[in-house]
């Protein structure tokens, strides 16, 4: 059985840990609101841009001059999985849920005889994926030094992806990230970026015909690379909000668990101390009676 001194040290250590988790919870809560507002502000822009490009692409998809980012290579043999995770842990299942979705997709593709490559954005995703896919990770980009996420960060990632696509390194690119829903709910999401998936018009909707100047192919050659950066930027913002939401929830649970542990340890300490005092009193009384 542990001594009273060991118990006091353990209780003090748990209290110190509780202070840390409480502080981390408060920091995450303060950063969550701003991150949530940024993610929610980016959604309509990204969705509308995707919709507009899909509208233009619907007319240009079958033309011989359609941009390769829209038409694709004509094959789907080599898949690039662009996995965006966080730079830090202590955030519950935030990182592992994204990696799990990407890993499941990778195994499904490999079972079909496809080749899979990984482009990791974020240290935590890279650390988990390299255990099983070390030779298939072609690039790892960390954003630890970035104080404030900006569109320039997404543009940099998009340029690297497009450069590899133009070099013929892959046929299909799929983005993996966590969509923020609430503090307690973040949804791992997969979105195909290359070739662009053109959404079919809703059933019963009236198709609208537009005349474009310049031609659709020329417009798309400019918009498609930008749309790729926009979708990646949206994913980074969604990830940022999801991270702080998951961290706030995880640290709240950790703080509560620490409180429960402190109460249990204190109860054991008091009972042990009481038993020792009782034992000493019995020994004193027994000694006095013997005299």
UniProtKB/Swiss-Prot annotation:
The keyword Cell inner membrane applies. PROSITE patterns: ATPASE_GAMMA. GO terms for biological process: proton motive force-driven plasma membrane ATP synthesis. It is a peripheral membrane protein. It is found in: Cell inner membrane. Pfam families: ATP-synt. GO terms for cellular component: plasma membrane; proton-transporting ATP synthase complex. Coiled coil: none annotated. GO terms for molecular function: ATP binding; proton-transporting ATP synthase activity, rotational mechanism. InterPro entries: ATP_synth_F1_ATPase_gsu (IPR035968), ATP_synth_F1_gsu (IPR000131), ATP_synth_F1_gsu_CS (IPR023632). Keywords: ATP synthesis, Cell inner membrane, Cell membrane, CF(1), Hydrogen ion transport, Ion transport, Membrane, Transport. Belongs to the ATPase gamma chain family. Produces ATP from ADP in the presence of a proton gradient across the membrane. The gamma chain is believed to be important in regulating ATPase activity and the flow of protons through the CF(0) complex. NCBIfam families: ATPsyn_F1gamma, PRK05621.1-4. F-type ATPases have 2 components, CF(1) - the catalytic core - and CF(0) - the membrane proton channel. CF(1) has five subunits: alpha(3), beta(3), gamma(1), delta(1), epsilon(1). CF(0) has three main subunits: a, b and c. PANTHER family: ATP SYNTHASE GAMMA CHAIN, ATP SYNTHASE SUBUNIT GAMMA, MITOCHONDRIAL. This is ATP synthase gamma chain. It comes from Rhodopseudomonas palustris (strain HaA2). The gene is atpG.
């Amino acid at each position: 059985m542990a001594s009273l001194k060991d118990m006091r040290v353990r209780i003090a250590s748990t209290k110190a840990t509780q202070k840390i988790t409480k502080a981390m919870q408060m920091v995450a809560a303060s950063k969550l609101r701003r991150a949530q507002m940024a993610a929610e502000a980016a959604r309509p822009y990204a969705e509308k841009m995707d919709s507009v490009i899909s509208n233009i692409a619907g007319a240009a998809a079958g033309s011989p001059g359609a941009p390769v980012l829209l038409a694709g290579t004509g094959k789907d043999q080599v898949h690039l999985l662009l996995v965006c995770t966080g730079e830090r842990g202590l955030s519950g299942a935030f990182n592992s849920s994204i990696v799990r979705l990407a890993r499941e997709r990778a195994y499904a593709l490999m079972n079909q005889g496809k080749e899979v490559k990984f482009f990791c954005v974020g240290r935590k995703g890279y650390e988990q994926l390299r255990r099983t896919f070390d030779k298939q990770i072609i690039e790892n980009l960390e954003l630890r030094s970035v104080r404030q996420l900006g569109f320039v960060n997404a543009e940099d990632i998009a340029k690297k992806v497009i450069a590899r696509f133009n070099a013929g390194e892959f046929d299909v690119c799929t983005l993996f990230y966590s969509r923020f829903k609430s503090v307690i709910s973040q949804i791992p999401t997969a979105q195909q970026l290359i070739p662009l998936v053109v959404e079919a018009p809703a059933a019963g909707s009236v198709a609208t015909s537009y005349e474009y100047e310049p031609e659709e192919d020329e417009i798309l050659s400019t918009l498609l690379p930008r749309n790729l950066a926009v979708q990646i930027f949206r994913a980074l913002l969604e990830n940022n909000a999801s991270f702080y939401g998951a961290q706030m929830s995880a640290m709240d649970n950790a703080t509560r668990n620490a409180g429960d542990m402190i109460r249990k340890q204190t109860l054991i300490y008091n009972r042990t101390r009481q038993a020792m005092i009782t034992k000493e009193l019995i020994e004193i009384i027994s000694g006095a009676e013997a005299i």
